[in-house]
């Protein structure tokens, strides 16, 4: 190993560990000038990972491609290409390279996991289920895969299967909030109010800044006409969730309307619109606001 390469590499590593990514990258660039062919793959991985952390997907992709050209059997580089293509919303190429990485490394559990995620976000549930199961077969403690599998089963109305795998996720990692949240969703859909409330609260204890817990609890309270409880939980959400979410103010506005507190509803609706103007079209057709559709302040807020 060239001594200059080694020195630049060590300094770059130290800066990376200290969190100075830009300076670390500059020193890895200097190291590359003195790199032997055998050093390049490791060096390109370092640069790819840094560019990925800097959210420069194109640059990261370029270095993963360089590794692939040097050694087509580097499964991690193919997997890296898939990850970057997914971040660039090129799902076809992402799918292709996840599958290619699995061909090179058949026991690549992370590739199966992220391929399953990719299928899931495209609503290709049967394929997602298949790949999550393969990930679990390779990594029995994959609590995230169990959770994600449970969420899919809930989406396709297979509630017993959903609860079974969500329980497995909790058994493996009791501190992970998502399976509790998803059990709340399942029990809510099954109209089991007390169970849904319990699991949403369990999720909140583990992740108090996750806005969807509060939104789902609010919807649950509204469904059972407990409007004061809906407002109280949204008060708590607005305190705990940062940055502020338009949906929290919107739901609280709806709850105030249920209690005929129109001034407070209008105030929250304005806050919601200020945070996200896309909510305007929804508000125009929302029956919760029917009583104030002709109100001057409402018209001013939504710009009718």
Question: What is the role of each PLM region?
Answer:
Residues 13, 45-53, 76-87, 109-120, ...:
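Conserved alpha-helical positions within TPR/SEL1-like repeat arrays
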Residues 38-40, 74, 108, 142, ...:
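Residue-level recognition of tetratricopeptide repeat
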Residues 1-7, 11-14, 274-304:
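Terminal, low-structured helical/coil segments at or just beyond the last alpha-helical repeat
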Residues 34-36, 70, 104, 138, ...:
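Structural marker of alpha-solenoid helical repeat scaffolds
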Residues 31, 66-67, 100-101, 134-135, ...:
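Canonical positions in the second alpha-helix
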